[in-house]
């Protein structure tokens, strides 16, 4: 990997990326309300479970396959699989989350003129666009390797979940850093599993997350949009 590719992925994984990731907890806040999360240890376990049981089977392998489709510029497959992913979101909140963040990232890519003209034209035709599809486009535009792309995406997800824990549990900064350090190995394992997953084995089934997300829509007190 070149320094330019590394910097591009650091940019994409940065919480400063203006796509609104900070406003979502992806069920974390609802799990806290249901007393599934109570302290730093249970927060770490919840985030680890989301990484290994949800992302590693669904979002990460989907991202890897969308990355390959952007490299091949297979517009039909990109649109078809993007529609499948959006439809697989199990609550209105989770669907709005991926659509809003995907749209914001796609707009950023267009404004910064990332990628060639033909692929940018294809990007503009995919609506609503899921976050992994837009992230794959941005990564492909910088010609980053699949393992590094998935690692950046997974780390960004872990960091955002940890940030939600700091605000909602609440936890201290050191406790948050301990969670991130503890999950480094799990990120590597999740990436390796995702890269070994064929397209027909991508699995986004996560009933507990779907139920918690649906409950969050009517939760009395909320900090986050999901």
Curated annotation (Swiss-Prot):
Required for maturation of urease via the functional incorporation of the urease nickel metallocenter. It comes from the Bacteria. The keyword Chaperone applies. Its main location: cytoplasm. It is found in: Cytoplasm. Keywords: Chaperone, Cytoplasm, Nickel insertion. UreD, UreF and UreG form a complex that acts as a GTP-hydrolysis-dependent molecular chaperone, activating the urease apoprotein by helping to assemble the nickel containing metallocenter of UreC. The UreE protein probably delivers the nickel. One of its GO terms (molecular function) is nickel cation binding. Belongs to the UreF family. One of its GO terms (cellular component) is cytoplasm. It holds the Pfam family UreF. This is Urease accessory protein UreF.
